[in-house]
């Protein structure tokens, strides 16, 4: 996180260039927005309250990198990130999801993110605790003596305590088993472990969904009042390790502090990406579905503007959450949004359609290029996959031409073409004798020629 905080806008753009081809203006806009957040944190408190994020509206066809830019930026900055579709929401009073739920979902993501980080910090200690529990299950007689209660003074007094020699022998045996456990010799041994299980109250009839919209988590409230039961389960040592590690890790985490950190992170570093904003940007005719679409815009306005939303973890202010709106705006224009909402997305960037050259670069340059992914996947079967320059050019050309003839779905068409070209290799990989496979222009055309020539077929398959 600290390393990212030291990145300049130019360096942020260079980081994004590793995964997304082109779209410099969009990368520049998000880099400035994130850098301004870092600048804001260095200001005196009085100025921090005044400086609000400048929300961004990305305009461009599908498959050109709008979502990927926002997602990669969130990963780089360690920010809680949520993508939602504007069309999923309905106006308050209608059946469906209210726009407030996006803030609650963001907080949930933030809590899970912080919890995961805290669990990673205590992993070593938790692994030691798991090891002790597994040893207790493997050698029950070596367990540490439990604290004797007042009543136990009368009932347990008759029980014979092990002699010093027996205790020494048990300790030695425990250490021998511990060594075998660490060497991985007992992974398939069956053991019986006790797991605490909370009794979940049945609350379906009480309308939990509606209560969550008010920031009330009835399940947790009632669940804390219910007794916990201990359930015995038989499983292998390796399964027990996977089961017990999160349980023991949670015991070491201060969840109150983790929750406070998560709320602060969601409020000050959260990013909400609202896709399909163009679908609700329709000039109202005063009746029909347009009324509901305008209602969703009006409901979005206070959240984007800055308000306080109640969540089950506590109140969350949306003033400093960065909102990135997105849409193709083929059938509508940004000016079709209600004026107040337009004003809340002051930075507008237009993403250009991808060219044939862009497709070639997408297949070669990104660190996660689909060609590199397939080379890595098939290398597990001992196959060396080689893409020649003319093979790459041919796939890019076919994808570009299909986008022109059929619907333009951007880079997604390219992925469909590559999948079709490599379909047979992926299927036959375990059985092929020739372990070096060259994907050139001739090979590509051999796999796609019949499909491309028949427009009806290509519209379904590619």
Curated annotation (Swiss-Prot):
GO terms for biological process? Answer: protein unfolding; proteolysis involved in protein catabolic process
Has UniProt tagged this entry with the keyword Nucleotide-binding? yes
Family matches, as SMART domains: AAA, ClpB_D2-small
Q: Which SUPFAM superfamilies match?
A: P-loop containing nucleoside triphosphate hydrolases
Q: Where in the cell is it found?
A: Cytoplasm
- GO MF terms, alphabetically ordered: ATP binding; ATP hydrolysis activity; peptidase activity; proteasome-activating activity
Q: Name one Pfam family in it.
A: AAA
Question: Which Gene3D superfamilies does this chain map to?
Answer: 1.10.8.60, P-loop containing nucleotide triphosphate hydrolases
Recorded hits in InterPro entries, A to Z, give:
AAA+_ATPase (IPR003593), ATP-dep_Clp_protease_ClpX (IPR050052), ATPase_AAA_core (IPR003959), Clp_ATPase_C (IPR019489), HslU (IPR004491), P-loop_NTPase (IPR027417)
Cellular component aspect of the GO annotation: HslUV protease complex
Give residues annotated as binding ATP.
21, 63-68, 275, 340, 412
Keyword line: ATP-binding, Chaperone, Cytoplasm, Nucleotide-binding, Stress response
- Determine if NAD is one of this entry's keywords: no
Q: What does this protein do?
A: ATPase subunit of a proteasome-like degradation complex; this subunit has chaperone activity. The binding of ATP and its subsequent hydrolysis by HslU are essential for unfolding of protein substrates subsequently hydrolyzed by HslV. HslU recognizes the N-terminal part of its protein substrates and unfolds these before they are guided to HslV for hydrolysis.
Q: What PANTHER family does this protein's entry cite?
A: ATP-DEPENDENT CLP PROTEASE ATP-BINDING SUBUNIT CLPX-LIKE, MITOCHONDRIAL-RELATED, ATP-DEPENDENT PROTEASE ATPASE SUBUNIT HSLU
Identify its protein family: Belongs to the ClpX chaperone family. HslU subfamily.
Q: How does it assemble?
A: A double ring-shaped homohexamer of HslV is capped on each side by a ring-shaped HslU homohexamer. The assembly of the HslU/HslV complex is dependent on binding of ATP.
State the protein's name.
Answer: ATP-dependent protease ATPase subunit HslU
Native organism is Pseudothermotoga lettingae (strain ATCC BAA-301 / DSM 14385 / NBRC 107922 / TMO) (Thermotoga lettingae)
Q: The organism's lineage?
A: Bacteria, Thermotogati, Thermotogota, Thermotogae, Thermotogales
């Amino acid at each position: 996180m600290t390393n990212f905080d030291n990145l300049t806008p130019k360096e942020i753009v260079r980081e994004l260039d590793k995964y997304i081809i082109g779209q410099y203006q969009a990368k520049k806009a998000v880099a400035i927005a994130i850098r301004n957040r870092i600048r804001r944190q260095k200001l005196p408190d009085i100025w921090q309250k005044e400086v609000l994020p400048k929300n961004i509206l990305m305009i461009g066809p599908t498959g050109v990198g709008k979502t990927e830019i926002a997602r990669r930026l969130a990963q780089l900055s360690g920010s809680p990130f949520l993508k939602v579709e504007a069309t999923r929401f309905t106006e308050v009073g209608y059946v469906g999801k209210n726009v407030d739920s996006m803030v609650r979902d963001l907080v949930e993501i933030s809590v899970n993110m912080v919890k995961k980080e805290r669990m990673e910090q205590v992993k070593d200690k938790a692994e030691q605790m798991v090891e002790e529990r597994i040893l207790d299950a493997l050698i029950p007689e070596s367990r540490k003596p439990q604290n004797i209660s007042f009543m136990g003074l009368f009932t347990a007094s008759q029980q014979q305590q092990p002699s010093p020699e027996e205790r020494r022998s048990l300790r030695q045996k425990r250490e021998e088993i511990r060594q075998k456990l660490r060497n991985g010799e007992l992974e398939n041994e069956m053991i019986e472990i006790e797991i605490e299980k909370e009794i979940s109250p049945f609350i379906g009839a009480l309308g939990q969904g509606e209560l969550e919209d008010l920031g009330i988590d009835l399940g947790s409230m009632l669940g804390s009042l219910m007794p916990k039961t201990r359930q015995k389960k038989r499983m292998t040592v390796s399964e027990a390790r996977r089961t017990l590690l999160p349980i023991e890790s949670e015991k070491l985490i201060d969840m109150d502090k983790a929750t406070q950190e998560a709320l602060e992170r969601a409020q000050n570093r959260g990013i909400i990406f609202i896709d399909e904003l163009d679908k609700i940007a329709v000039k109202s005719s005063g009746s029909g579905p347009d009324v509901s679409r305008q209602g969703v815009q009006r409901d979005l306005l206070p959240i984007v503007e800055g308000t306080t939303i109640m969540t089950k973890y506590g109140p969350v202010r949306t003033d400093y959450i960065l909102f990135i709106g997105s849409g193709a705006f083929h059938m509508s224009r940004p000016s079709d949004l209600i004026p107040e909402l337009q004003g809340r997305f002051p930075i507008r960037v237009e993403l250009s359609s991808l060219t044939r050259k862009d497709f070639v670069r997408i297949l070669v340059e990104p660190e996660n290029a689909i060609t590199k992914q397939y080379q890595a996947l098939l290398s597990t079967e001992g196959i060396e996959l080689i893409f020649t320059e003319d093979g790459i050019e041919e796939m890019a050309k076919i994808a570009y031409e299909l986008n022109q003839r059929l619907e333009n779905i951007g880079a997604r068409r390219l992925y469909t073409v590559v999948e079709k070209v490599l379909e047979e290799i992926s299927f036959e990989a375990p059985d092929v004798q020739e372990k070096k496979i060259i994907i050139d222009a001739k090979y590509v055309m051999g796999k796609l020629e019949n499909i491309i020539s028949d427009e009806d077929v290509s519209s379904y398959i590619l």
